[in-house]
């Protein structure tokens, strides 16, 4: 084999080695990108969950219809037993209506400062394919509420869960104030707005509450 052929062969082998290394690096990089992306996404989600807090003091700043719609889209993405979706939502924006609710509900006085409120309700007329009403509406509506609260946190808004169901006097007050039909039961009232000040979340993690395999 002459010198020219030897040099060509060496160059070809070197080129092949370089291409192989490049392909392996790209595969590893692609795998890392997918892994890093997943880790980044999970980190953002966890941080948002851990940052959520109950906000009871609000700045004098409006919340747009687009923001409310985003909150409701998040709420209705919640899990629901047998896909029955027994939830209904009442959005209150008027100052007079907000103040009226605040007067009627002892634990929702912050409505006088909030920009809006969303009342999460269960629809007792919703039935499954066998005509049976939902027995899990409180679970489904609670899941929707938590989605809403987490979305509010992610959007820089503040919100707080104020309970209505199963307290009879609160049920009567909210149904009367909002003109709810008999088959609509309010689970809670969620005041919404921009936080006043810098409220801080509570670290509620407690390893003693965890059991593996059995108690």
Residue ranges and their predicted role:
Residues 2-215:
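Acidic, surface-exposed loops and disordered segments
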